[in-house]
Amino acid sequence: MQPSASPGLPLPKYCSVATTVKAPDLHGAVPPWDMSFTCPFATQAPWLATHCTFTRCTACCPCLHTVDRPWPGLRWLGRVGAAGGSWVLARKEPDGFYYLAQIKAAPELEKRGALVVEFEAPLVTGLELPAQQQRVVFPEDVIQFSPSVPHSLQLGDKVLAPWEPGQQRYGPGTVLVGLKKQKGQRASKEKEITVHFWNGKTTKVPLGSVRWVPPTVWKKAVERLQAPHTRDCHSSCLWVPHCSQLGPRAGCTTHRHPLDSSFLCPPCLSCACCQLQCQSSCPLVGPSWWPLTRTSELTTRKLPEPEVKPTAQLLPLQGPKEEPVAELSYNMFSSSSSSSEEENSESHLEMGLPLRQMVSRAVNTDPILSETTSLQQYSPHKPEWRYWRRNGPEPPPGKPGR
């Protein structure tokens, strides 16, 4: 086992006991937002450096790579810390739809590339509708919502709009009847516009509930709703920020689960990230290393010991083609003694049974049975009448040995 690169840090793949980093006192303050859908270590590290930023895997993996580059901030929300109170449409897991929410002040998280939003309480309670709660989301999952300044919509624009009677969930759609006057048409004076949604429904939506989005945002929203594996990944899961003292980590594997997935939140198990790289990037995830016993058990199951099966019967050597069969029979009845003892034993066998057996010294094999003797009378076990002794001649049958 090699020594650890830094004192107090566990060795990758081998250590089963790690050192837990004690969190500094933050005046007993507890984050007010709900981190139930995030990885548990995200709530254990609010004191990390503010230049550590959260980023999401481009392949929609739930575990997030961490980078040590400065976050540019939310341009449409102004400077960092001034986003509190703004109304937005935030995408909420696990359904992937957008809901009306309000941004809460959290400057520390904004500097790292995340936002705290509070979803509006639904007018009609139901199992599918979200309750009023606070969540941590990413800027790319937030759409500006300004009821007083509607966007001038026209035919073919990509929007987010509610299609249900309750108007709680917002989905991607395309405007069929816009507000601007086209060639040969009059300007629409209606308070509703017609939107064709991604699920094939066409509905008239109030103008104040429709929000224009860029085509890239619209395309990403459609892909998340249409691809089942994307919805199951729960890509809004936050991960521990990168520790700058250990150097950057990169790469992500999604081909199998790690040996111990207790360090991930339950929704992330279907698309778990590489445990070795995630744990080696931050000392806070030390207690989740898998023990040595589980690794050894897995290795034992993968590499079973081969079983040696003896041959059913001795086969006679009829020619040069059957030399491997004769050699195999000889190896089963011979021991690991020296070559000189084997030669003495063969000479004694020749002297003891000159009439019933013949020895082929050229190929160094077991005695050859005569043609008149049936092979079915013999077995790979030792005959009862044979006197097995290596340091003396074998007596004839019926006479005791010396």
Curated annotation (Swiss-Prot):
InterPro entries: DUF4537. Residues 332-402 are annotated as: Disordered. Residues 393-402 have a biased composition (Pro residues). Residues 370-379 have a biased composition (Polar residues). It comes from the Eukaryota. It holds the Pfam family DUF4537. This is Uncharacterized protein C11orf16 homolog. It comes from Mus musculus. The lineage of its organism: Eukaryota, Metazoa, Chordata, Craniata, Vertebrata. The gene is D7h11orf16.
